[in-house]
Every structure is written in structure tokens, then in C-alpha cells.
Amino acid sequence: MKIGIVCYPTYGGSGVVATELGKVLLQKGHEVHFISYQQPVRLTRFSQMVYFHEVLVSEYPLFEYPPFELALTGKMIEVAKDYHLDLLHVHYAIPHASAALMAKNILAQEGISFPYITTLHGTDITIVGRDPEFEPVITYSINQSDGVTAVSEYLRNETYKHFRVKSHIEVIPNFICLQEVEATQPDKELKNKIAPDGEPIITHISNFRKVKRIEDIIFIFQKIRDRMPAKLLMIGDGPERQKAMQLVKNLSLINDVHFIGKIRETYPLLKISRLFLLTSEYESFGLSSAIKLLQEKDLWEKFHQNSINQSRKFDSFEIVKLYEAMYEKVLSQV
């Protein structure tokens, strides 16, 4: 199949998942076309079967804000016609779904079938999408999609709860490349540099938005640090980073907390971490459990092994099969 993938090129979850999906589809013999305003950060290798098409937005004095959605629609149409795409897969509803719908309708006037699938990732539904000015457009764009997926049962339920969506939403979870994870070996030199006295390393990765409750990460680490030596790695960037850095200074944790910034490959740091800590509004990890896992090696090992066993259910090659089945289903109906 010739598949167009539209995503944000950033370090956020939707962009990473979309890029990794395209890379696996490429390995399985499909032709993949990425469409975005920048090259996706996780798209580092190119071949004859993978393409990147940049959306260029012209700036005119008349427009206070550049018309990105129109430029995106035009690029979708251009790529669909020039490369004879079979379908388009848009990740994150705003504004990709409405742009895809416009492109589909314009191409239909020329006798070209251009089905699109919308994947809902999170804040496009739970936060941003609930804005009264966005909701009618998002609802209509989702309902007009030829296929709709959500990355979790929770997100599907939230979509039905807050939007007038009539379309069937299929849950296809996020995935990880187990082969790549298992191939990454712990870097002892890196670990010793971060934790020279063998302190357990705690890691957080996010886009540092308010919903991630970044300050709570710091306060939790302070409680852990009061009981035992530890190091905290804060990976990523976003609007809450400066506030978190100031909090670290105020709590005198500056020698134990490292703000790494944006990095392409997180596996090496995760491999040397004892705990991955999340405190987002819709995700949580109990402080008492965190401390106990850090202190009791046998319990941590059991937790670790159970996590590995569970993660095998989300291997990229298995999950991508679900997307392929969705593509084939959509194409059979147009």
C-alpha cells in the first residue's frame, strides 16, 4: 500500500507513535509518505520507500496567523495526486482531521478516492478538543473519517462522553519496538557518570505540559531523597520546565536532578533507570510503591519481570498488524 501519514514532528507521543508506525510499515514493504511542517524527530533514516513532504506556510501581512490548515490541505492533495496514495492516516485530530476531510472532498470532485483514518491520541480529545470553538469541527471531522482509532479504552470512552461522535472507534494501543529495546545494553559508563555512588536513577519523560504535573515529580523525588540517595533525570522540554528548574533550586536538589532536554533516543537512559515516574492528571504512580520498589530489590525484580511480560503484548510488529487490517478494511469499503 501507499500510505500518507500526517503528524506533528515533535517529541510528543502522537508524533513518535506516528513515526514509529511508518518505520514498521516500511519494513513490511509498504510505501510511506510523511506530511508535516518539519521532518519528524524520530525519522532519521530514508530509503526508496519512505518520503517526507514539508508543509510550507506563506506569510502575508493580511493574516495575523499563517493559514497552516489550508497549506496542509494543499500538500495532502499534492502528495495524493503525485504519488497515487491509497489512503491517508492522520495522527492527532487538530487540525489534521479537518484538513484531511477537506482534501478528500476536493479530490472527490476530480474523481479521486482518498479515504482517511483519524487516530486520537490524548489531549486532542481530553483538553484542547473540548474548547467550544473546536468541538463542532472535531466532531464532524471524526464522524466523516473512513476509520477512527484511539490509543486506549479510556480515550475512546472520553471521546464518546464529550463529543457527539457516531462513528465506531477501534482501540489500537500504542506500541514499542521490543527488538530495539532488548538490543540496547545498559551503559555502565553513563550510569556511573550520572550516579557515581550507585544511587538508583529515576526517570521522567514528557512534553512538560501542565497536565503532566511536573512539580509533583519534583515533590515526590524530594520525599524519596529524604529517605535515601537517588538521582532524577527529567527528559524533554515544554512550558513547565523553567518552573520545575526553579523549584529544584528552591528545594536544594540541584545536585541530584538533571534536566536533559529533548533527545531522540531515550532507550539508553531508560536502560540504566530503576524507575520511570509518571504523575500526569490521567496517569499515576503511588509514592509508597515507588519507595518500596527502590528499596527492596527482590520485589523490584518481580515487578520488572511482570512489566516485561506485559509489554510483549504491545510489540510494534503485532500492533502494526492491527493498523494494516484497518487500512485493508477501509480500502475494501471505498
Question: Which stretches of residues belong to each language-model region?
Answer:
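N-terminal strand-loop element at the rim of the active site
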Residues: 7-11, 23-68, 169
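An amphipathic, basic-hydrophobic alpha-helix
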Residues: 61-88, 97-98, 102, 132-136, ...
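Carbohydrate-associated surface elements
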Residues: 154, 175
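A short, well-ordered alpha-helix in the C-terminal region of glycosyltransferases
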Residues: 299-313, 325
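Conserved donor-binding/catalytic core segment of Leloir-type glycosyltransferases
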Residues: 195-221
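Aromatic "clamp/platform" in nucleotide-sugar-dependent glycosyltransferases that forms part
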Residues: 262, 281
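Nucleotide-activated donor-binding/catalytic signature segment of Leloir-type glycosyltransferases, i.e.
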Residues: 245-261
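A short helix/loop element that forms part of the nucleotide-sugar donor recognition site in Leloir-type
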Residues: 181-196
